């Protein structure tokens, strides 16, 4: 396995764990769309504290995951 693949695998597992942690906090966060809950997309909600930090971390990890995926797919071998 290439080192970038290992890093991407670890990031994917971390994102999955964070998504599962966020799934209990409201119907707009985490993996709510996969669990079949009603999505309240247009309701005004404001997450605070630990939930907000987890959301920001997950967003950053997903963006880094996408960037690494693009770099890995276009890198010469």
Curated annotation (Swiss-Prot):
Provide the primary localization: membrane
List UniProt keywords, sorted A-Z: Cell membrane, Membrane, Protein transport, Translocation, Transmembrane, Transmembrane helix, Transport
Q: Does the keyword Chaperone apply?
A: no
Recorded hits in InterPro entries, A to Z, give:
SecG
GO terms for biological process, alphabetical: protein secretion
A GO cellular component entry from the record? plasma membrane
Q: Where are the transmembrane segments?
A: 3-23, 56-76
Topology of this chain in the membrane: Multi-pass membrane protein
Question: Is Transport found in the keyword set?
Answer: yes
Where does this protein reside within or beyond the cell?
Cell membrane
**Single GO term (MF):** protein-transporting ATPase activity
What family does the Swiss-Prot or TrEMBL record give for this protein? Belongs to the SecG family.
What job does the chain carry out?
Answer: Involved in protein export. Participates in an early event of protein translocation.
Protein name as catalogued:
Probable protein-export membrane protein SecG
Taxon lineage: Bacteria, Bacillati, Mycoplasmatota, Mycoplasmoidales, Mycoplasmoidaceae
């Amino acid at each position: 396995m290439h080192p970038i693949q290992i890093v991407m695998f670890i990031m994917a597992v971390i994102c999955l764990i964070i998504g599962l942690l966020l799934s209990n906090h409201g119907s707009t966060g985490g993996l709510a769309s996969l669990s079949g809950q009603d999505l309240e997309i247009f309701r005004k909600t404001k997450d605070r504290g630990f939930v907000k930090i987890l959301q920001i971390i997950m967003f950053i990890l997903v963006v880094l995951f996408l960037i690494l995926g693009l770099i890995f797919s276009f890198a010469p071998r």
